[in-house]
Amino acid sequence: VTPAPRTEQETTIATLTLRTGFEVELLAPAGSDRQVLADDLAARCGGSVRRSSHTDSEPSAVPGVGLFRHLSPAFDVVGPDGAPVARLVDDITIEADVAAAPRTPPGHRGWYRVLCDDARLLRLVERHVDPAAALPDVLAPIAALFGTVVELVGGAARVNDATGATVAVAMPLPGGRERPCEVITPPLTRDHGAALDALLAPARALGFTVPVEAAVHLHVDGAPFRRPAAFANLVRLFGRWREPLWAALGTNPACRRLAPLPADLVALVERDEQTGWADLGAAARGTGVTKYADVNLTQLVAARPVRDTVEVRILPGSDEAAAIVARAALVERLLLRCLDDRPVPAPGADAVRDPAGALAALAGVPA
């Protein structure tokens, strides 16, 4: 997608310097779906759309099964040279607007989810199935792996192992789940606002809107924060400055899967003893760090990170590139402040009166 020209507002107010990936949560209008946007974006850049799967999890109603993990339809937009443009996926936290609208019948466009109660098995399933296959056929490679057959039960397909234990089930996509559309960008190194606008302006033109629970997530490279001083400052920023950050950024109170950092983690970085990164990272893993917090540090402290990023999750939902970049610019400056070995101080009284001003002062932004 060709980026739109940079607006005067973007040029003079908000410019990002860090390599940054964005996740922007949108909602397709009733009767439409995320593939419509994928096809439109591909047509605009002379690229193509590749069907893929998105992994997520949700609480299970089955006794003894805590979570059901699933694969849902995702769409990767690539340019004519094969370079990634955007990835469009479901987001199960988007519920209110879907529930309020008349439901479409299950299995929109023949779409389905593949469910499994074991993360390792689901990774095996994802590796072997064709995400574009029809529901009755998608699990055939898994049945072959286990030496069994696909059982068709009503509108679902199931594979059991030789003992009768269920490996995976494919079921029609619940009505309405075709509408949530999280737009995931590749890492952007320049012209962040223009690149975002090239994705969001077409979405607005197609009637996509910002859902009730929406958020915008930022991913920046994690490596610079894998030092004790920088990591401690990152924890201090999001641990001590939570209320000013929410106020200054306009965090959406309806957004789900946000939480403060564990108190044990905040205490850990204030200990007097000197320790190297390996020991600090291992200790941090034991404090209950979770992805679903205001800032996702799980990949930063993981022994084997899957995605080597720090994920900031508290920006409010928006479909306007300039607004997203303006908020991201403050976050970027605060993250850069964390790389300074001087400890990030606790907020003072001014942070209550003027949270945006206090954060700007902390970040070193000129008044």
Regions found by a protein language model. Name each.
Residues T2-T209, A223-A367:
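C-terminal accessory/tail domains of diverse enzymes
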Residues E213:
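Active-site histidine-anchored catalytic micro-motif
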